[in-house]
Amino acid sequence: MSSFQRLNIVRKTGFVAGVATLAMIAVSFSGGPLVAASCRTDAMAGIDWRECNKRLLMLGGSNLDSAMLYGTDFTYTDLRGSSLKGANLEKAKLIRTALGEANLQGANLTKVEAYRSDFSAADATNAKFVNAEMQRTKFENTKLDGTDFTKAELGRADFEGATLNGSKFSLTNLSRARFGGAKLGGPVDFTSAFLLLTRIEGVDLSAATGLDQKQIDIACGDAKTKLPNGLTAPASWPCPEDPDDD
């Protein structure tokens, strides 16, 4: 073999190796197999499970603090008692997900899909549920101090017994949601919230902000409901029970 032929082989080998390297880099940036490999990694603090399929799993008690869970699918998954402090769950799917007694302090749940999920007795202090889809979701006895539900869809959500100090429900759909026994010890913002048949029987709303008479007129309270100064109970109170309350 001549020196010229050997030189051509070296050049071709180097070119192929370079192409392979570039292909690996392209795959990693495009979210291909290199990124997908992290989906098989066990739960741990700071894990990157973005857009992974985590449906129908038993992950109760997991430590997912500060985890990257953007777009992750947790449909029907059990995350009860798990810690997700500071986790990024933006656009995650939490449909019928069990999150009872989970720690979600400071977590980002912006634009999550969480129909019929259960956050009962969880701690979601200072969490963000902005623009979230959470119809019929349970927040019974949940800590929601400083939690932001701005523009969220919370029709028929259950906030019975929840702690809501300084929470935000601005522009939120709360139609037929239930707040019986909820504790609103701080200024809760209901500016432009939709309160059609929202159950506020016995709730102390005296420190709430952003409420107007039109909102109160379509809500459901009773003689024990405390309203902010200047607002009065409509003659339609109390409302009959909702036949579709399940």
Regions found by a protein language model. Name each.
Residues 7, 11, 24-25, 39, ...:
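Exposed boundary/loop context
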Residues 3-20:
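Bacterial N-terminal signal peptides that target proteins for export
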Residues 30-246:
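Tandem repeat scaffolds
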